[in-house]
């Protein structure tokens, strides 16, 4: 497997988005970058649009998503991902300080991670 991305989607607990963003930007992202992670982007999902065709007519339904946080990380290959996961998530700092705080801000049972490979024309490689 060659280079790929993780698209990570979290549900932030109600009323915790500002606190989560501060924690991500001041603590988690710098910590993970220091450990070797490559972060391509960090986003708040404002809304989702779903499209369908009904009776030959295209329709769009929009849903507000103010508690959804999305970020993208890049890995060289599966071994690189496993090495960085171990360096981050098995570290004393993560287990004793960062991880417990994460559990106070997001619903860890709702985390979704999509592994993506860029297509030939993608600018993200």
Q: Where are the model-predicted features located?
A:
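Alpha-helix boundary/capping residues
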Residues: 24-27, 88, 101-102, 109
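Helix-capping/helix-break motifs at membrane-protein junctions
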Residues: 13-14
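Core segments of cupin and vicinal oxygen chelate
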Residues: 17-40
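Short, structured motif recognition centered on aromatic/hydrophobic residues
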Residues: 4-9, 20, 32, 67-73
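Short amphipathic alpha-helices within nucleic acid-binding modules
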Residues: 18-22, 65-69, 77-90
């Amino acid at each position: 497997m060659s280079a790929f991305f993780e698209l990570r989607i979290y549900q932030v607990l109600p009323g915790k988005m500002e606190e989560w963003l501060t924690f991500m930007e001041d603590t988690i992202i710098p910590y993970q970058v220091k450990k070797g992670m490559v972060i391509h982007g960090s986003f708040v999902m404002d809304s989702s649009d779903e499209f369908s065709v009904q009776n030959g007519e295209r329709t769009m339904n929009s849903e507000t998503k103010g508690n959804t946080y999305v970020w993208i990380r890049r890995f060289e290959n599966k071994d690189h991902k496993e090495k960085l996961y171990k360096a981050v998530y098995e570290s004393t700092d993560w287990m004793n300080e960062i991880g417990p705080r994460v559990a106070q801000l997001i619903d860890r049972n709702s985390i979704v991670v999509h592994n993506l490979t860029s297509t030939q024309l993608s600018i993200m490689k």
